Amino acid sequence: MSDQEAKPSSEDLGDKKDGGDYIKLKVIGQDSSEIHFKVKMTTHLKKLKESYRQRQGVPMNSLRFLFEGQRISDHQTPKELGMEEEDVIEVYQEQTGGHSTF
């Protein structure tokens, strides 16, 4: 693995005492960095989004999380979205402004 590539890391989200079904999700950023999250099927994805934002050090309102091309809302769960082991969530930084020069 080259120095340029980010090594995947993982984080557990969800209440350990509660048991339940967990899946591992891959969150891939625009820079192709990959972070693995172990998430309970009934955990609101807001928790995953907040954890990702903190790790990346960016404001939450600047990130867009997509699963199978559809934007993920905070209150949705992996179960609601039909997510399975090793599914991928894509993260994009929202770009605003800019202007064209003629």
From Swiss-Prot:
The keyword Chaperone does not apply. Pfam families: Rad60-SLD. It is found in: Nucleus membrane; Nucleus speckle; Cytoplasm; Nucleus, PML body. Residues 1-20 are annotated as: Disordered. Keywords: Cell membrane, Cytoplasm, Isopeptide bond, Membrane, Nucleus, Ubl conjugation pathway. Interacts with sae2, ube2i, ranbp2, pias1 and pias2. Covalently attached to a number of proteins including rangap1 and ranbp2. Interacts with sox9 and sox10. PANTHER family: SMALL UBIQUITIN-RELATED MODIFIER. It comes from Xenopus laevis (African clawed frog). Cleavage of precursor form by a sentrin-specific protease is necessary for function. It comes from the Eukaryota. Residues 21-98 form the Ubiquitin-like domain. GO terms for biological process: cellular response to cadmium ion; cellular response to heat; protein sumoylation. The keyword Membrane applies. One of its GO terms (molecular function) is protein tag activity. Ubiquitin-like protein that can be covalently attached to proteins as a monomer or a lysine-linked polymer. Covalent attachment via an isopeptide bond to its substrates requires prior activation by the E1 complex sae1-sae2 and linkage to the E2 enzyme ube2i. This post-translational modification on lysine residues of proteins plays a crucial role in a number of cellular processes such as nuclear transport, DNA replication and repair, mitosis and signal transduction. Residues 99-102 form a propeptide. GO terms for cellular component: cytoplasm; nuclear membrane; nuclear speck; nuclear stress granule; nucleus; plasma membrane; PML body. There is a cross-link at residue 98 (Glycyl lysine isopeptide (Gly-Lys) (interchain with K-? in acceptor proteins)). Belongs to the ubiquitin family. SUMO subfamily. This is Small ubiquitin-related modifier 1-A.
